[in-house]
Amino acid sequence: DFKREVADVDFVQDNESKSSYGVVRGLHFQRPPYAQAKLVRVVKGKVLDVAVDLRKGSPTFGHHVAVELSEDNHRQMFIPRGFAHGFSVLSDEVIFQYKCDNFYAPQSEGAVAWDDPDLDIDWRIPADKALLSDKDMKHPRLKDILGEL
């Protein structure tokens, strides 16, 4: 239930990004003690928003949830601490907003490869059309960082 999950979250930072069709961001997370929960939404355009459970011992560890967020459906997605997050841009451009309950801490930054075959995520973007930052192209597979979680 959305109210139960978000009611006690104290958001401390708001962010906004602008991207164009084909951009894939992620899959990013922060390790404790700087782990972050996020509340994300689209102001303009459309994305496929993805969260991957990285909580060791969770019955859904390594599984993902993918939800379309758009300016038309007005959906938001809450990503709890312990999940990696990413999105793909499905419209010509997107303005994406997210609230975080902890500040960005580069020393605790972690990531999983967007195209990790073990995660089997359908980003709804053809692989040859996916646009990634140099940084996002170099992330390891989940199985290669298990000891760091």
Where are these regions (language model features)?
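Non-catalytic, conserved peripheral segments adjacent to functional cores
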Residues: D1-R75, S88-E93, Y98-L149
